[in-house]
């Protein structure tokens, strides 16, 4: 079937900062120093696209302390999401898990705790004992869970990461990088349950015996930074002070990671500075959505009907505020169709920005249309003859 190609050219010209130079749409001045910090590595990333907006030593391997728990959290969230486990499942805590030390909620060995409460304590107060209890429940033992952690890291293209435990407690060959931390945090932030637990600032963790352990959120930005989606802290003598955090304002979602800071205050100030820079210099621009399909229809053979289309998703791009961009839409659609089912993919649209292909979105049928019968064809011939 022949394809017809429709090209629409849209000029999206933003006049807020007309003095800015025009660059290739994929070019970002990622090496520009945007924070005054002594941290060893940092990265600022657009959450939706994964584009790095700014970085320093972001691929350097280094210890990240409890930020390792982001992968423990991610694997637990995935198991909950796919139905393998539930937040109400009961976990019997082993002697090994209860004796982890470091940051903890002081779990009672041989007692049962719900998955949801254990996960919350990992997210809120970085509980080592809860991390190991979840690892043992999910995989049978911590080392098997660590194997899953490293497999997931490989899947996410975290090329500078190796896990040796589920907690981030010091281990000889355990490391990650600022960029890899941003990659795993990007995945974690997609879960509503994570964001829900991340908003907890102060809460009592209730044990089966009735005693309580007070949990205080280790991520101060969850309370004091507008639009904070969640994050993870980490600190050891080797890793110093680390933080990965996400925030959203005006439809723009950013991730900031700072590793190897000299003190706790610096990790929060460094990430805040990066986020502030991002929100003041970048915007999330819609370059294709349903409105672009208002005048795009497909003829149905043998019928007095035109098929309307639905976009599978919209397309956005993060670009510098005030930057001029040119958007071309190249529609790849059949000239006509005989029949179609609702939500069936019937074509696609390529989004081309400044002459470079940026995205491709499937276009779906808006409804069912059956193939016309013999009588329908006769009726159509009659109508055309009379008309």
What are these regions (language model features)?
Residues 2-5, 64, 115, 374:
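Structural motif marking the loop-to-transmembrane transition
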Residues 2-27:
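Sec-dependent N-terminal signal peptides of Gram-positive bacterial secreted proteins and lipoproteins
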Residues 3-5, 70, 249:
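Hydrophobic alpha-helical segments, especially transmembrane helices
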Residues 3-5, 26-27, 31, 294, ...:
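Polar/charged alpha-helical tracts
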Residues 6-9, 37-38, 60-61, 118, ...:
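Generic detector of short alpha-helix boundary/capping microenvironments
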Residues 16-17, 82, 286-289:
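Residues in and immediately flanking transmembrane alpha helices
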Residues 21-179, 183-192:
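Active-site-adjacent loops and short helices of periplasmic peptidoglycan-processing enzymes
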Residues 158-159, 170-175, 179-387:
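Domain-terminus/edge residues, biased toward the C-terminal soluble/receptor-binding domains
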């Amino acid at each position: 079937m022949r394809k017809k190609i429709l090209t629409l050219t849209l000029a999206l010209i933003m006049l807020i900062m007309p003095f800015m130079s025009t660059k290739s749409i994929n070019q970002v001045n990622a090496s520009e120093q945007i924070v005054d910090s002594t941290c060893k590595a940092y990265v600022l990333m657009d959450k939706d696209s994964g584009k790095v907006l700014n970085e320093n030593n972001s691929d350097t391997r280094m210890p990240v302390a409890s930020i390792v728990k982001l992968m423990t959290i991610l694997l637990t969230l995935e198991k909950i999401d796919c139905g393998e486990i539930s937040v109400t499942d009961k976990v019997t805590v082993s002697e090994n898990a209860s004796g982890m030390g470091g940051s903890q909620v002081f779990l009672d060995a041989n007692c049962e705790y719900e998955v949801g409460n254990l996960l919350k304590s990992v997210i809120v107060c970085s509980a080592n004992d809860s991390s190991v209890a979840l690892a043992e429940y999910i995989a049978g033992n911590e080392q098997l869970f660590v194997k899953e952690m490293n497999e997931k890291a490989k899947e996410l293209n975290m090329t500078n990461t190796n896990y040796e435990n589920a907690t981030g407690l010091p281990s000889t060959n355990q490391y990650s990088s600022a960029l890899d931390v941003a990659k795993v945090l990007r995945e974690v932030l997609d879960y509503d349950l994570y964001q829900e637990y991340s908003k907890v600032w102060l809460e009592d963790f209730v044990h089966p015996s009735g005693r309580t352990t007070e949990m205080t959120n280790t991520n101060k930005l969850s309370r004091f930074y507008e639009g904070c989606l969640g994050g993870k802290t980490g600190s050891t003598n080797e890793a110093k002070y680390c933080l990965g955090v996400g925030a959203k304002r005006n439809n723009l979602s950013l991730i900031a990671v700072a590793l190897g800071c000299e003190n706790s205050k610096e990790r929060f100030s460094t990430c805040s500075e990066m986020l502030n820079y991002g929100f003041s210099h970048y915007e999330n621009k819609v370059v294709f959505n349903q409105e672009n399909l208002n005048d795009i229809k497909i003829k149905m053979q043998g019928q007095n009907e035109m098929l309307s289309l639905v976009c599978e998703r919209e397309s956005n791009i993060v670009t510098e505020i005030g930057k001029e961009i040119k958007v071309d839409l190249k529609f790849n659609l059949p000239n006509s169709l005989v029949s179609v089912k609702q939500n069936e993919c019937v074509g696609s649209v390529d989004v081309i920005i400044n002459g470079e292909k940026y995205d491709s979105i499937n276009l779906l049928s808006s409804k069912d249309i059956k193939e016309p019968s013999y009588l329908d064809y006769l009726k159509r011939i009659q109508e055309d003859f009379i008309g």
